[in-house]
């Protein structure tokens, strides 16, 4: 049985209030279906105008895998921060670990990447998430990421 949805749609304005990241390093456009079990889906619309495509690779642009991992971490950060109850919301998320990372297929301009993230552990301010990056339902990357939520 699926956990109930707590936040159905987190738009870019709310993400900007939640994360400290800004252009060119804010790598998610929205977060969908944040559930009570600390899972959710980050969405990134990959366009040819991404700064990374100037050098990766001009003749055959491929969205860098490390930016997908950062997109996973940013999605996890939004889920973690919005899952904290009460008025003392954390103001920063520090990316701590990457484990079991695999890149399976290239992501190109025009693709919509969905970062399917779910919490796999939590201890005090430390959170761990498993993530699958998907394009049209196909896994293009996966990783476990750890982060610390702090003031």
UniProtKB/Swiss-Prot annotation:
Q: What is this protein called?
A: 3-hydroxyacyl-[acyl-carrier-protein] dehydratase FabZ
InterPro entries named among the record's database cross-references: FabA_FabZ, FabZ, HotDog_dom_sf
Gene Ontology terms: cellular component? cytoplasm; membrane
Tell me, in one coarse class, where this protein mainly resides: cytoplasm
Instruction: Give the E.C. number(s).
Output: 4.2.1.59
Tell me what gene encodes this.
Answer: fabZ
**Catalytic activity of the protein:** a (3R)-hydroxyacyl-[ACP] = a (2E)-enoyl-[ACP] + H2O
- Key words of the record: Cytoplasm, Lipid A biosynthesis, Lipid biosynthesis, Lipid metabolism, Lyase
- Cite the SUPFAM superfamilies for this sequence: Thioesterase/thiol ester dehydrase-isomerase
So which domain of life are we looking at?
Answer: Bacteria
Please name the PANTHER family in this protein's record: 3-HYDROXYACYL-[ACYL-CARRIER-PROTEIN] DEHYDRATASE
Q: What is annotated as the active site? A: 56
Organism of origin is Nitrobacter winogradskyi (strain ATCC 25391 / DSM 10237 / CIP 104748 / NCIMB 11846 / Nb-255)
What GO molecular functions are on record for this protein? Answer: (3R)-hydroxyacyl-[acyl-carrier-protein] dehydratase activity
Q: What broad taxonomic lineage does this protein's source fall under?
A: Bacteria, Pseudomonadati, Pseudomonadota, Alphaproteobacteria, Hyphomicrobiales
Q: What is the documented function of this protein?
A: Involved in unsaturated fatty acids biosynthesis. Catalyzes the dehydration of short chain beta-hydroxyacyl-ACPs and long chain saturated and unsaturated beta-hydroxyacyl-ACPs.
Q: Where, per UniProt, does this protein localize?
A: Cytoplasm
Similarity section: Belongs to the thioester dehydratase family. FabZ subfamily.
Q: Name one GO biological process term.
A: fatty acid biosynthetic process
One Pfam annotation reads FabA
